[in-house]
Amino acid sequence: MSATRIQAVYRDTGVEAYRDNPFIEALPPLQESVNSAASLKSSLQLTSSDLQKSRVIRAHTICRIPDDYFQPLGTHLLLSERISVMIRGGYVGRNPKTGDLQKHLQNGYERVQTGELETFRFEEARSTAQSLLLIGCSGSGKTTSLHRILATYPQVIYHRELNVEQVVYLKIDCSHNGSLKEICLNFFRALDRALGSNYERRYGLKRHGIETMLALMSQIANAHALGLLVIDEIQHLSRSRSGGSQEMLNFFVTMVNIIGVPVMLIGTPKAREIFEADLRSARRGAGFGAIFWDPIQQTQRGKPNQEWIAFTDNLWQLQLLQRKDALLSDEVRDVWYELSQGVMDIVVKLFVLAQLRALALGNERITAGLLRQVYQDELKPVHPMLEALRSGIPERIARYSDLVVPEIDKRLIQLQLDIAAIQEQTPEEKALQELDTEDQRHLYLMLKEDYDSSLLIPTIKKAFSQNPTMTRQKLLPLVLQWLMEGETVVSELEKPSKSKKVSAIKVVKPSDWDSLPDTDLRYIYSQRQPEKTMHERLKGKGVIVDMASLFKQAG
């Protein structure tokens, strides 16, 4: 069997309510938060040898970061715990050993036969299913986190003694401009993928009404002991095709009550209006608990958020730039947050795009200025959403909360191609470019195996410069003599002549100032912001003494 389809092996959980329930005891063991975090965390690591590879190979490795990197935060552990409780709690009222499951199946059979959702044969058949509403902006990591958590469970468990294929979870997506009936069809489709069955052909393609479809879903869900039904992207549902928000709410409430299995609904803030009345209600009539999945915050209660610091510090280590800064500065971290607003997808992709830009430019270093430039050039599609988040106005946030960003993924691919198109120069190619004539290059090729380029090239250039009329055949003995004598040609070439003064200071172009160390005044100037003076930046870096605080300390 595959990793998602296993034979049942039963373990006592230690929880009395779960004892002797095969659907619960066949699940993976209950985990502490620390172990849960370890099981969710990605194993992506980079080595020093990765750093020495060609730019093309490094670019491909960098582009794997959005898919392979995952750092569990507090919200992930909360969601993991809620899912664990929902799955196991939902099975408490459907224990096949106590007859509870059979009661649900008999009630489901009655509903299918009569076509009425309120019909039952066993009134005392109780439901222990819980429901959950997960709301968050597009790119905040809801779906990625869910996939990570669900991947810690096998999807299908076969119970030989019961002859039952238990489906632990099922995830379906709402299509754009979809209808409520499409949710039912997607349910049968997803179940067929998990089990290799043909429920869609048997039930989905017939002209059943919504009530009949829900009755069929209920019966099949209980027949396969479905542990959790996840419906993602509910903001895509068409209100006009679904009869309006109230009709949609009624559908989801009925689905939770009738199917009798835990249901999780996921969407952006646009979907919140469907459940607004229920969320405002003190009684919570529909029973939807809610998690609002906000972007990670930069500060908490006026202090730096340690989760944001830990997340960015760990991500910063996944650099394949040869001139990278070992430690992430507060300045770069602050700019990173300002641009991304803590939206996880943007945080990671801004980092990846900045690395690719640094590779393409050849400076191989991420700076605050580079992050700003990449944000302006590459992330235009999500500027409205991020500006709405900066405003803090709920109406604006809801309007732009479901912006998708396929353009960013396209840019990742394009930057990979751009880097691949840049010709990687070998040391030999670079050396040949430094020499002026074919004769000089011929001499270099003859001697390059025996002498270091840093000495060989200036020696050849000096020989041709001092003897412009001699052929390379005649200059060869002279070059060899100088090389064997170990004459310090480089230092002589750098000596200023009488007729021409040569500055001993190497001039760095202003366009290259952002590649200097971050303590260099020129680097600090290159990272200036319009709203801050140079004096304020120097003061922030600790270059200028704060006289007021100094006098205060002196008393």
From Swiss-Prot:
Residues the record lists as binding ATP: G136, C137, S138, G139, S140, G141, K142, T143
An example Gene Ontology biological process: transposition
Listed InterPro entries: AAA+_ATPase (IPR003593), AAA_22 (IPR049945), P-loop_NTPase (IPR027417), Tn7_TnsC (IPR021542)
Taxon lineage: Bacteria, Pseudomonadati, Pseudomonadota, Gammaproteobacteria, Enterobacterales
GO molecular function, one term: ATP hydrolysis activity
Chain positions covered by the region annotation Interaction with TnsA: 495-555
Keyword line: ATP-binding, DNA recombination, DNA-binding, Nucleotide-binding, Plasmid, Transposable element, Transposition
Protein name listed in UniProt: Transposon Tn7 transposition protein TnsC
Function: TnsC binds non-specifically to DNA in the presence of ATP. It is required for Tn7 transposition.
Organism this protein belongs to: Escherichia coli
DNA-binding region: 388-407
Subunit structure as annotated in this protein's UniProt entry: Monomer. Interacts (via C-terminus) with TnsA; this interaction allows TnsA to bind donor DNA.
